UniProtKB/Swiss-Prot annotation:
Record HAMAP family: RuBisCO_L_type1
PANTHER family for this protein: RIBULOSE BISPHOSPHATE CARBOXYLASE, RIBULOSE BISPHOSPHATE CARBOXYLASE LARGE CHAIN
Entry-linked Gene3D superfamilies: Ribulose bisphosphate carboxylase, large subunit, C-terminal domain, RuBisCO large subunit, N-terminal domain
Origin species: Persicaria senticosa (Knotweed)
Residues with the N6,N6,N6-trimethyllysine modification: 8
Name under which the protein is recorded: Ribulose bisphosphate carboxylase large chain
Misc: The basic functional RuBisCO is composed of a large chain homodimer in a 'head-to-tail' conformation. In form I RuBisCO this homodimer is arranged in a barrel-like tetramer with the small subunits forming a tetrameric 'cap' on each end of the 'barrel'.
Binding site for Mg(2+): 195, 197-198
GO cellular component: chloroplast
Length: 469
């Protein structure tokens, strides 16, 4: 690769340069685990090396300008390949990237390199990024979440239990005033948060400024009546970064505690800009993962959500939707809890049974609160409390607004169910075994909860799991 060797034109096998089984990864390398499905006749070593090359310094032919740089210093290296158990012709290729390949503090640049061109590569039938190890040296170039779990609890003055939320439905079509009314009723009934749906931005039936004003009124009215701090996730997502920041500025001027962003459709550059604004101005930031299933649903191609979750923790967000394990949206228990730990904890050990391919130290990057949302109702409360623990937001949209008596009773039912589960857990009871009994007993003292129990006693969303190891 040095100029003195002389330049020899032509196409050579990637594995001669980029497959290095003897390489010991450095502490400051970014490590990636790819699930590779090569085309028939392509050896796994060549496929793994091709991934390393095309996502770092390589191109399809030898170029004479290779002689002007130290390829050994900058190239990605495929350092290990292992077959995937139970799958024919699938391999996990481990690739190490030198840190100098990436711009500091830019998730955008990291993804452009690692998953940019290589996913359209002809030698591969399919390719999936299963996990990334982000070294502390790179992590420290990111601000991360605007505030993190502990600061959020201090701002809200809420401790020792999960937080309760509700997405306002119907998601599209309400006028701003009716929307604000639904927000008020839910918050007044006992919820901590209400939420704009991900596709509520600024449409003809409800412009963003009107919605912000009516929701702020609902927040302050419910706060003064309950003595609790309340919030509504005001969706600041917009067509341009400038417009998004303008909406966040208006939210700050109204004095509300939290705004929201759709981080995948909005993009990582916009998300990181908003996260910086939120930290500088005391706003919490709720993140919705709209579009994630386009990227992470296929088992053999795309990017696993645990990578998107890590990227969000780096880019910045205080809450992110993370599946439910029990509702209508997909999420397998061990795998979901794997990326929930990656969002919340300071240090996560490698654990292949939960899909965690690398030990991940987060140094002092604040944590993100996972949000369980999608098809959940009061009967799920014991399971959700046990699975997600205190540092979570449990979000019941239809499970609040679908209550036969209205929005406020729906909120009250959820709050009573949650308080009953937390109390039972603190007394040492087994929520998994005794959950239904705990809810039934609580419903004797809460007519709202009793009505909710009756409505949703038969509802189940049971389909085969897609996300298996």
């Amino acid at each position: 690769t040095k100029a003195s060797v002389g330049f020899k034109a032509g196409v050579k096998e990637y594995k001669l340069t980029y497959y290095t089984p003897d390489y010991e990864p450095h502490d400051h390398d970014i490590l990636a685990a790819f699930r590779v499905t090569p085309q028939p006749g392509v050896p796994p070593e060549e496929a793994g090396a091709a991934v390393a090359a095309e996502s770092s310094t390589g191109t399809w032919t030898t170029v004479w300008t290779d002689g002007l740089t130290s390829l050994d210093r900058y190239k990605g290296r495929c350092y290990n390949i292992e077959p995937v158990a139970g799958e024919e012709n699938q391999f996990i290729a481990y690739v190490a990237y030198p840190l100098d390949l990436f711009e500091e503090g830019s998730v955008t640049n990291m993804f452009t390199s690692i998953v940019g061109n290589v996913f359209g590569f002809k030698a591969l039938r399919a390719l999936r990024l299963e996990d990334l190890r982000i070294p502390p040296a790179y992590t420290k170039t990111f601000q991360g979440p605007p505030h993190g779990i502990q600061v959020e609890r201090d701002k809200l003055n809420k401790y020792g239990r999960p937080l309760l939320g509700c997405t306002i439905k119907p998601k599209l079509g309400l006028s701003a005033k009716n929307y604000g009314r639904a927000v008020y009723e839910c918050l007044r009934g006992g919820l901590d948060f209400t939420k704009d749906d991900e596709n509520v931005n600024s449409q003809p039936f409800m412009r963003w400024r009107d919605r912000f004003l009516f929701c702020a009124e609902a927040i302050f009215k419910s706060q003064s009546e309950t003595g609790e701090i309340k919030g509504h996730y005001l969706n600041a997502t917009a067509g341009t970064c400038e417009e998004m920041i303008k909406r966040a500025v208006f939210a700050r001027e109204l004095g509300v505690p939290i705004v929201m962003h759709d981080y995948l459709t909005g993009g990582f550059t916009a998300n990181t800009s908003l996260a910086h604004y939120c930290r500088d101005n005391g706003l919490l930031l709720h993140i919705h993962r709209a579009m994630h299933a386009v990227i992470d649903r296929q088992k053999n191609h795309g990017i696993h959500f645990r990578v998107l979750a890590k990227a969000l923790r780096m880019s910045g967000g205080d809450h992110i939707h993370a599946g439910t394990v029990v509702g209508k949206l997909e999420g397998e228990r061990d795998i979901t809890l794997g990326f929930v730990d990656l969002l919340r904890d300071d240090f996560v050990e490698k654990d292949r049974s939960r899909g965690i391919y690398f030990t991940q130290p987060w140094v002092s990057l604040p944590g993100v609160i996972p949000v369980a949302s999608g098809g959940i109702h009061v009967w799920h409360m014991p399971a959700l409390t046990e699975i997600f623990g205190d540092d979570s937001v449990l979000q019941f949209g239809g499970g609040t607004l679908g209550h036969p008596w209205g929005n406020a009773p729906g909120a009250a039912a959820n709050r009573v169910a949650l308080e009953a589960c937390v109390q039972a857990r603190n007394e040492g009871r087994d929520l998994a075994r005794e959950g239904n009994e705990i809810i039934r007993k609580a419903s004797k003292w809460s007519p709202e909860l009793a009505a909710a129990c009756e409505v949703w006693k038969e509802i189940k969303f049971e389909f085969q799991a897609m996300d298996t190891l």
